[in-house]
Regions:
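FMN-binding flavodoxin-like domain, especially the glycine-rich phosphate-binding loop
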Residues: 4, 12-16, 24, 28, ...
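A short, well-structured beta->alpha microelement
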Residues: 26-40
């Protein structure tokens, strides 16, 4: 199974979290900023795990916005794409908590992509480190995806 992490970040936390998941689960995978990834190349042979923070008033980080905009404007059929989403947010901003991952997830599903499992979320105001939530979440998501692919 090909695994590709695509992240959106302002401060580097999402990228580091992808690396933590890869290392802790001993995955052979790619890790790429959404800002450096051509949305038209999403393929059905790869399982995509999106990790993104929320910026400003519930927006995607600047590194993820071009990816989002390309899908929103081109409206591709993504029915061949399987993905999961993990969002980083802060409940101090309860009205827009983890909205970056939410709006990305909604767009992908709207274009026909198949989401595996539930969206994972980390609250920066909690005592938990992001990797303490994301690593077990990712392990569960990968188990679900492997079982469905078998």
């Amino acid at each position: 199974m090909n695994i590709h992490f695509l992240y959106g970040t302002e401060t580097g936390t999402s990228e580091m979290l992808c690396e933590d998941i890869r290392d802790d689960l001993d995955l052979q995978c790619e890790i790429t900023s959404m800002g450096d990834f051509d949305a038209s190349t999403l393929d059905g042979d790869t399982f995509y795990i999106f990790v993104t923070s929320t910026y400003g008033t519930g927006d995607l980080p600047m590194t993820a916005q071009p990816f989002y905009d390309a899908i929103a404007s081109n409206k591709p059929d993504l029915s061949h794409v399987n993905f999961a989403v993990f969002g980083l947010g802060d409940m101090v901003f309860a009205d827009t908590f983890a909205f970056g991952s939410k709006i990305l997830m909604e767009l992908l599903v709207d274009r026909g992509a198949k989401m595996v499992g539930e969206r994972g979320i980390h609250d920066a105001s909690s005592a938990d480190m992001p990797e303490d939530i994301a690593v077990p979440w990712a392990a569960g998501i990968l188990d679900i995806h492997r079982a469905a692919a078998a």
